[in-house]
Amino acid sequence: MPKIGMEPLRRRELIDAAIRTIGQRGSLDVTVAQIAHEAGVSPALAHHYFGGKDKLILATMRHLLRELGRDLNAAIKQANAPHERIAAIIAVNFSAAQFAQETIAAWLTFYVHAQQSDDIKRLLRIYARRLHSNLVFALEQLTSRARANRIAEGAGAMIDGLYIRHALGADAPDAASAIALVEDYIAIQLSGQPSAEN
């Protein structure tokens, strides 16, 4: 039997191991045994805590979303103006915790498998709605609601696109460049200038 009080630690170790294993393989075609081995625990213990691979995968996604939400809430509390709020949202999406090579690969894998999994698709839609609503809340203090929605849609697509680009690249993720690209896009849109250079 698992030791009393060890469950939260073991669950977190298994979730972290799932991120690494999925990220390394670039696929959800992993087994509980492989994840358990990566975590240094027995497959039986992994099954005890999660009940199977599908539940472990969903728990991993929920964990990433919870971490993102927690970090975002903390960053937004420090923002005193709309521009600061926008900067905080962008920065958190490219933070070291989220924009690490294995985490990026895991996110990309989740997007691919959302086509076959309603549960994964639902979680990704929740993420997209939260990102959009957070951006719109700040942007509509600087422009019309219709324009805020359009800019937020573009910024969200850009963030997703940068994750995909870095997942396919061999170089280490460059968070500073990614943040600058999204911030520049939003600044250009708010200024009313065309998004492409003449």
From Swiss-Prot:
Keywords: DNA-binding, Repressor, Transcription, Transcription regulation
GO BP annotations listed: glycine betaine biosynthetic process from choline; negative regulation of DNA-templated transcription
Molecular function, one GO term: transcription cis-regulatory region binding
Domain HTH tetR-type: 8-68
Pathway recorded for this protein: Amine and polyamine biosynthesis; betaine biosynthesis via choline pathway [regulation]
Coiled-coil segments: none
PROSITE patterns (UniProt xref): HTH_TETR_1, HTH_TETR_2
DNA-binding region coordinates: 31-50
Domain of life: Bacteria
Function: Repressor involved in the biosynthesis of the osmoprotectant glycine betaine. It represses transcription of the choline transporter BetT and the genes of BetAB involved in the synthesis of glycine betaine.
Name assigned to this protein: HTH-type transcriptional regulator BetI
Lineage start: Bacteria, Pseudomonadati, Pseudomonadota, Alphaproteobacteria, Hyphomicrobiales
Name of encoding gene: betI
